[in-house]
Amino acid sequence: MAKKRRNKLRGTNGADELTGTSRKRRIYGRGGDDIISTPEGRFKVWGGEDNDTFKTLNGGKGYMKIMDFEAGDTITFCGCASTRIEQRGKNAWIVKGDDVKAVVKGVDAGDLNIDFDQAVITMSADPMA
């Protein structure tokens, strides 16, 4: 069972499904293949180890700031043609029309692949790895 502390929601070292609330605006997935989603509002989220899925809000206002996105992780979105990835400073921004859906901290927009048919965004394979 996920542990709850103050404004933080913490997962376990197994696979968890975590949803933020108006009182839980920092979400830590920890280990396991976690699914993290957020309602309206602004949230900071960490998937932790393993392959995590970050579900963006379709409709409504607010976004998640993904603090540790890495190869193997996935961002789900509406699949809408108006969704795009922009580089703003050191972060990649997932934007639908004029509404921000997610900010991916420390990631270059050019390193992300957007698949409209599958409605997912993933990290590009590193050709140097």
Task: Provide a role label for each language-model segment.
Residues 1-63, 83, 93-94, 110-129:
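Glycine- and aspartate-rich repeat motifs characteristic of hemolysin/RTX-like Ca2+-binding segments
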Residues 59-61, 70-83, 100, 107-110:
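Acidic glycine-/aspartate-rich tracts in secreted/extracellular proteins
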Residues 72, 89-93:
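A generic structural signal for beta-strand entry/edge sites
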